[in-house]
Curated annotation (Swiss-Prot):
Its main location: plastid. It comes from Zea mays (Maize). This is Small ribosomal subunit protein uS14c. Residues 27-56 are annotated as: Disordered. Pfam families: Ribosomal_S14 (PF00253). Part of the 30S ribosomal subunit. Gene3D superfamilies: 1.10.287.1480. It is found in: Plastid, Chloroplast. PANTHER family: 30S RIBOSOMAL PROTEIN S14, SMALL RIBOSOMAL SUBUNIT PROTEIN US14M. GO terms for molecular function: rRNA binding; structural constituent of ribosome. The gene is rps14. GO terms for biological process: translation. Keywords: Chloroplast, Plastid, Ribonucleoprotein, Ribosomal protein, RNA-binding, rRNA-binding. Belongs to the universal ribosomal protein uS14 family.
C-alpha cells in the first residue's frame, strides 16, 4: 500500500492539470500555429505565460496509480490495477471476462 500522502499528492496534480488544461493547450496551439505565425516577441510572451503556470499542472507530471493500493508501477490501463492485484482478482474470479492463460 502506498503512503496516503503520495496518493493525495497525485490527486492534487490531477486537479491542477484539469484546471489549467485549456490554458496550456491554447497557449501551445498559438505558439505552434502555422496559419497565423506569431512574431518572436509574441512567442516569448506566450512561452512566459506557459512557464508561469504551476509545474504540477503539466500532464507529464501525472503518474498512473493502482485503484486499490496506490502502487505506481506495473499498472494495466484497462483495469486501473497493478499487476499483482489484477492477478489476485482474476484468480478469485472477480473480473468478468478475464481468464488465466494456459497452453
Amino acid at each position: 500500500m502506498a503512503k496516503k500522502s503520495l496518493i493525495q499528492r497525485e490527486k492534487k496534480r490531477q486537479k491542477l492539470e484539469q484546471k489549467y488544461h485549456l490554458i496550456r493547450r491554447s497557449s501551445k496551439k498559438k505558439i505552434r500555429s502555422k496559419v497565423s505565425p506569431l512574431s518572436l516577441s509574441e512567442k516569448t510572451k506566450m512561452q512566459e505565460k506557459l512557464q508561469s503556470l504551476p509545474r504540477n499542472s503539466a500532464p507529464t507530471r501525472l503518474h498512473r496509480r493502482c485503484f486499490l493500493t496506490g502502487r505506481p508501477r506495473a499498472n494495466y490501463r484497462d483495469f486501473g490495477l497493478s499487476g499483482h492485484i489484477l492477478r489476485e482478482m482474476v484468480y478469485a474470479c472477480l473480473l468478468p471476462g478475464a481468464t488465466r492463460s494456459s497452453w
